Amino acid sequence: MKFDPTSPSLNIMLANPRGFCAGVDRAISIVERALELFSPPIYVRHEVVHNRYVVQNLKDRGAVFVEELDQVPDNNIVIFSAHGVSQAVRAEAKARGLRVFDATCPLVTKVHLQVTRASRKGIECILIGHAGHPEVEGTMGQYDNPNGGVYLIESPADVETLEVRDPNNLCFVTQTTLSVDDTLDIISALLKRFPSIEGPRKDDICYATQNRQDAVRNLSADVDLLIVVGSKNSSNSNRLRELALKTGTQSYLVDTADDIDSSWFENITKVAVTAGASAPEVLVQQVVQAIAKLAPSVVTEVEGRKEDTVFAVPAELR
């Protein structure tokens, strides 16, 4: 289907902030620097960030992505992904003599430390997150006290059926790719059932997740369609799409410009484009160019919250 070239201009509104966050920037930089300083192959446990384009680019430069450490030969370099790993994985790497560079996002590490402290004190810990996500697996793997317990919940319904040892000795943490709004109802249910439960400090919330969701929320009411640039296995990218759908705005998740379907734009005059925290800006610009070919278009950068957070790479890689 082709658009009538005489049709009204399509207003393409670019959300801000969008795309790479400081944790993703740092993780990619760690792999790039390791490839520059040491001879390939450089092994990376799990996709360093959840973006197909980024992973393929690093593969082409000599990175080898594996799911488990038994795929890494002894005495080699291994990089842990931005999502973090369990204590058991760290112990295995040490026992195998692997040289580790840790690309775990510092905000994920803060959550890990909370769980570790809870384990040490025997406080039972509840994690709000999505089963099967590597960050969740790594976070739950920080708890090793057999006299306590760590539990995963995904919804208010899970709170009602949750069985704990001591309802007066509880804390909770959240997956970093969930925003305040994502967890609001679950936390309310936790506080109602366990009034003495302790939660994380507000400054432990991932700024990037919240900022990108706020930008989508602010734009959704003013557009007919939202395009999210991100891979299907990217939790935060999926949340952006879901947020738009909840507000009544049609939304699609695209990995690249090749995924754009012209039928989505029938009778559309305003479209917003954003990107998950692991999607590079080059993909955003390619998507914008693909949309602009469908009809006479005007591209507008929408003002949003400024981000200046930077996380340093390990000293050995500087």
UniProtKB/Swiss-Prot annotation:
Binding site residues for (2E)-4-hydroxy-3-methylbut-2-enyl diphosphate: 50, 83, 133, 176, 234-236, 278
Gene3D superfamilies in UniProt: 3.40.50.11270, 4-hydroxy-3-methylbut-2-enyl diphosphate reductase, catalytic domain (3.40.1010.20)
Binding positions (dimethylallyl diphosphate): 50, 83, 133, 234-236, 278
Enzyme class: oxidoreductase
Membrane spanning residue stretches: none
InterPro entries with a match to the protein in the record: LytB/IspH
GO cellular component, one term: cytosol
The protein's required cofactors: [4Fe-4S] cluster
GO MF entries: 4 iron, 4 sulfur cluster binding; 4-hydroxy-3-methylbut-2-enyl diphosphate reductase activity; metal ion binding
Ligand binding (isopentenyl diphosphate): 50, 83, 133, 234-236, 278
Keywords (A to Z) from UniProt: 4Fe-4S, Iron, Iron-sulfur, Isoprene biosynthesis, Metal-binding, Oxidoreductase
Catalysed reaction, written as an equation: isopentenyl diphosphate + 2 oxidized [2Fe-2S]-[ferredoxin] + H2O = (2E)-4-hydroxy-3-methylbut-2-enyl diphosphate + 2 reduced [2Fe-2S]-[ferredoxin] + 2 H(+); dimethylallyl diphosphate + 2 oxidized [2Fe-2S]-[ferredoxin] + H2O = (2E)-4-hydroxy-3-methylbut-2-enyl diphosphate + 2 reduced [2Fe-2S]-[ferredoxin] + 2 H(+)
Pfam family, one: LYTB
Example GO biological process: isopentenyl diphosphate biosynthetic process, methylerythritol 4-phosphate pathway
EC number, UniProt record: 1.17.7.4
UniProt remark on cofactor binding: Binds 1 [4Fe-4S] cluster per subunit.
UniProt-annotated catalytic positions: 135
Binding site residues for [4Fe-4S] cluster: 21, 105, 206
Family designation: Belongs to the IspH family.
Function comment: Catalyzes the conversion of 1-hydroxy-2-methyl-2-(E)-butenyl 4-diphosphate (HMBPP) into a mixture of isopentenyl diphosphate (IPP) and dimethylallyl diphosphate (DMAPP). Acts in the terminal step of the DOXP/MEP pathway for isoprenoid precursor biosynthesis.
Protein name as annotated: 4-hydroxy-3-methylbut-2-enyl diphosphate reductase
